[in-house]
């Protein structure tokens, strides 16, 4: 990236870019849905491919001059299919939400009944929230987790499925720290004649590395983002069985999108190539190791976690016994250069703008090179900030010392 070219044309935006780079370098990033892309992925996003309109699909475009962007999209599709063992892939979704929209449009009619995970229990806006298109176009019925364990209540899922006879069951979450049993979801779907869709946006990297069960053999359709644990550009993708390929492709284009972002698709292809490597698998193992180390260290310091730990890259702090809200802790940690997000916990007595929880994740800190012993240090800082707001200056010092060991993009700007 040549900041000087940007600065000559638009010094204000150049300044914003530099400030954001500085923020990323000088804060511990614990937002579970964020990560730092490789330089190769970053560079692929800023190429002449951004100039090309390419409505349609490779070999079936509505514009001329697409022979080379066709090659980029074919590489992305083939690599994605190989990565997850899928029959068909669509790499055009601009986001995970648009991937989900296309999947719904392909499988459902307005008003159809769908079973999805409650947002307050770890689901996602696009899994039936009333403020989202999904909850407005379709009749969503929500399932959740058991209050005593924090694990998905599969008995409840089956009971609701038998009662409501949904056309589609959606599995997947944005704040669920445990392994999801896709085989069990498939069995429930088959009992009521429903399609099964899995949104694996958060866990795609773990699935690719074999650290979480792969939903592809069980689901009719699988959607994902390409960032988060997959560590690619911001965007989405859809995998499906061949029998749904035509409907999925048509639902995305011309159904819900026009021209694809070919520079982003090229960056997705780079990301998928990286994800097929042995190095990526080792990286995913370190994400989980770090998450378990952070979770255990927090619990050792008296911090409760929803479900009592984690199997993946994230955890949910239950702050109900601490006297501090999720909103307050998010602010406190940001003041000492630790970035996280307040998050509702299951059966939360507080509203979504305050919350009784905070969500933490380890993909970004693992990308920086941090290790389990660093997670213990971070847990200790967080525990002290929960208990004592006056610990701020000491916490800042400890954060700065930790970040010094792991520079971010040292050769950039």
Swiss-Prot record:
Query: What Enzyme Commission number does this protein have?
Result: 2.1.2.1
Cofactor(s) in the UniProt record: pyridoxal 5'-phosphate
What InterPro entries does this protein map onto? PyrdxlP-dep_Trfase, PyrdxlP-dep_Trfase_major, PyrdxlP-dep_Trfase_small, Ser_HO-MeTrfase, Ser_HO-MeTrfase-like, Ser_HO-MeTrfase_PLP_BS, SHMT-like_dom
> What SUPFAM superfamilies has UniProt attached to this entry?
PLP-dependent transferases
Q: Where in the cell is it found?
A: Cytoplasm
Indicate the principal place this protein occupies in or around the cell. cytoplasm
Site (Plays an important role in substrate specificity): residue numbering on this chain: 227
Q: Which domain of life is it from?
A: Bacteria
| One term under GO cellular component | cytosol
Residue numbers binding (6S)-5,6,7,8-tetrahydrofolate: 119, 123-125
| Family matches, as Gene3D superfamilies | Aspartate Aminotransferase, domain 1, Type I PLP-dependent aspartate aminotransferase-like (Major domain)
Sorted UniProt keywords: Amino-acid biosynthesis, Cytoplasm, One-carbon metabolism, Pyridoxal phosphate, Transferase
Residues carrying N6-(pyridoxal phosphate)lysine: 228
Query: Subunit arrangement?
Result: Homodimer.
Family under the similarity heading = Belongs to the SHMT family.
Please explain the role this protein plays, according to its UniProt record: Catalyzes the reversible interconversion of serine and glycine with tetrahydrofolate (THF) serving as the one-carbon carrier. This reaction serves as the major source of one-carbon groups required for the biosynthesis of purines, thymidylate, methionine, and other important biomolecules. Also exhibits THF-independent aldolase activity toward beta-hydroxyamino acids, producing glycine and aldehydes, via a retro-aldol mechanism.
HAMAP family named in the record = SHMT (MF_00051)
Q: Could you tell me what this protein is called?
A: Serine hydroxymethyltransferase
Q: What organism is the protein native to?
A: Caldanaerobacter subterraneus subsp. tengcongensis (strain DSM 15242 / JCM 11007 / NBRC 100824 / MB4) (Thermoanaerobacter tengcongensis)
Give the taxonomic lineage as stored in the record. Bacteria, Bacillati, Bacillota, Clostridia, Thermoanaerobacterales
Q: Tell me the name of the encoding gene.
A: glyA
